[in-house]
């Protein structure tokens, strides 16, 4: 595809499926896999009684450090027999510093591989890791469902969600290595307005751009016959046999941080296939 540095972030034991998928993708891409093991201190020292904060703070940091070191040891043992190039690093952060720590790693990765941040199997810090990778790190992220994914064949049939936004176009450009290698790419345009800049040819300019890159692209104009765009896209993915969705990641502001907007969260909560997103 063209992704030569792949990053995955592990924050708790048991994220085996995510690590295995990242390994398989690195092997397929002949990429270097960077694994970042993070111990997160969730304590709020401001709530401790006077005189105890310094001791309790250090105790909490020590616990997080021990957890990070244990994660690193476990990951190294799992990667030792693998025939890929890999590196593992561990670090500790308080919850408020996770975003900066993750963003520093994500900004130099070609692709970040993470598990779905919602549902009973999600790691407690998964949403914060995803938001930091996307919005502060500026990296494209492949979000995997909790079920096993056949990474070796991933991206044969790709559904692209197109709504003329800057975010969608940026995601598509970051996904070009996937799209160029795919057997079929379908540009899904849901309920387009006849008064939009694309007028009577929704998706036409995008299809032309992709075709010039050698992408085997078609357009599907879909009526919004279900309550949400997410449901329309998921139904189309099932009908077309798509094994990956490419879409823009939309954000809203929370103080100085960007967090996922409702539409992006809604899709990730309900997606049954891998989603490659960027902003």
Describe the predicted segments one by one.
Residues 24-26, 101-150, 236-279:
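Gly/Ser-rich helix-loop-strand patches that form or flank binding pockets
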Residues 77-112, 212-245, 251-255, 273:
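Structural beta-alpha unit
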Residues 55-70:
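A short acidic, glycine-rich active-site loop
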Residues 43, 96-98, 121, 151, ...:
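Generic structural signal for helix capping and beta-alpha/helix-loop junctions
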Residues 12-13, 62, 92-95, 118-120, ...:
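Short histidine/acidic/glycine/proline-rich micro-motifs that form metal-
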């Amino acid at each position: 595809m063209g992704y030569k540095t792949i990053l995955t972030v592990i924050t708790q034991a048991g994220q085996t499926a995510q690590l295995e998928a990242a390994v398989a993708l690195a092997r397929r891409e002949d990429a270097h896999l960077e694994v970042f093991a993070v111990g997160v201190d969730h304590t709020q020292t401001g709530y401790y009684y006077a005189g105890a904060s310094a001791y309790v703070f250090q105790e909490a940091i020590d616990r997080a450090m021990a957890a990070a070191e244990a994660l690193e040891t476990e990951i190294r043992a799992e990667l030792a027999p693998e025939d890929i190039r890999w590196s593992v690093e561990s670090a500790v952060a308080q919850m408020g510093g996770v975003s900066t720590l993750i963003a520093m790693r994500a900004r130099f990765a070609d692709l970040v591989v993470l598990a779905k941040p919602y549902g009973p199997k999600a790691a407690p810090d998964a949403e914060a890791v995803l938001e930091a990778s996307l919005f502060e790190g500026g990296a494209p992220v492949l979000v995997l469902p909790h079920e096993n994914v056949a990474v070796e064949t991933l991206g044969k049939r790709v559904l692209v969600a197109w709504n003329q936004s800057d975010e969608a176009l940026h995601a598509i450009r970051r996904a070009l290595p996937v799209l160029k290698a795919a057997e079929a790419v379908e540009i899904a345009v849901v309920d387009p307005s006849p008064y939009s800049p694309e007028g009577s040819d929704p998706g036409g300019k995008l299809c032309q751009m992709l075709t010039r890159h050698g992408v085997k692209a078609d357009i599907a104009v879909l009526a919004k016959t279900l309550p949400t765009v997410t449901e329309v896209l998921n139904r189309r993915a099932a009908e077309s046999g798509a094994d990956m969705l490419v879409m823009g990641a939309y954000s809203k502001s929370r103080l100085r941080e960007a967090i996922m907007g409702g539409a992006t969260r809604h899709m990730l909560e309900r997606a049954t296939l891998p989603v490659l997103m960027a902003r």
